[in-house]
Amino acid sequence: MPPPPLISLDVEGVYFKTRIATLKSIEGTYFTKLFETNWREQLDRDGRLFIDRDSSVFPVILNFLRDHEKCSLPKDEYQLMRILREAVFFKIGPLRNMIEHKLRTFCTCPPELPSTPIPNQILTQKENVPIVPRNLLLSKPPPPPPPPLPSLMQPKDTVQIPMRKPPTGRNSKKIKTSADSISLPRNFTHIAHVGWNGASVLFDKKMTDDPTVRKICDAAAEAVDLSAVYNVVNKNADEESHSVEVLITGGLMQSRDGTSRH
């Protein structure tokens, strides 16, 4: 009797050799569909079938296809989530059910992927759903909490740029605006805070090479009243990111490159 046919797999650069019957041991999986096609045409010149998946988790996939429910699983939640992701990709339903059941029973985190029902599982008790009074349903929701206060700027995280001294005179307005007093807009990420602390411009060191921050600092340095405070913010990474410039007192400022800044 000839030996069962073997196949060599190249999973992310790691080589595995197993029986084709092992890969086809569970119906409806990725491998059963694969071997229904001309899979030999996908072999490389060394006779290996390349699979672009996680090679560190693939041994668990092979063990389950060989031993089925007798396969032991790790207890670490992170490893279980990685195996669950591979089980979903390879469409191994019994392995997916085992992992989701283990996550719900023993681990603290809920499964990341939508759960599927486990066979032969019967719900024996109804959940106790609290009854909410009608007056609470019709009442207005409580107001949202106030926005958090801006974090204090540490001296080591700021760079000071000397600026002109404000004009002194009887009619001159002495307005001192602190950079820390400008609150951040909601649902935005704070990239840089540019403002005047009474003697110099303050802004984040990380943004010193940013062209937008440089223009803002140049414009603030050319201001006559020296009361401009700017925030540079973004939202949703690069999708909705933009700079927001806030001028406390009106007036027109010119940056050093001649661009008008309002």
Swiss-Prot record:
Outline the extent of the BTB domain.
5-107
Q: Where is the CRIB domain?
A: 182-195
**Between which residues do disulfide bridges form?**
none
Query: Which superkingdom heads the taxonomic lineage of this protein's source?
Result: Eukaryota
GO biological process, alphabetically ordered:
protein homooligomerization
Q: Which Gene3D superfamilies match?
A: CRIB domain, Potassium Channel Kv1.1, Chain A
Output the SMART domains linked to this UniProt entry: BTB (SM00225), PBD (SM00285)
* Record-linked PANTHER family: BTB/POZ DOMAIN-CONTAINING ADAPTER FOR CUL3-MEDIATED RHOA DEGRADATION PROTEIN FAMILY MEMBER, RE57120P
- What is the protein name stated in its UniProt record? Uncharacterized protein T23G5.3
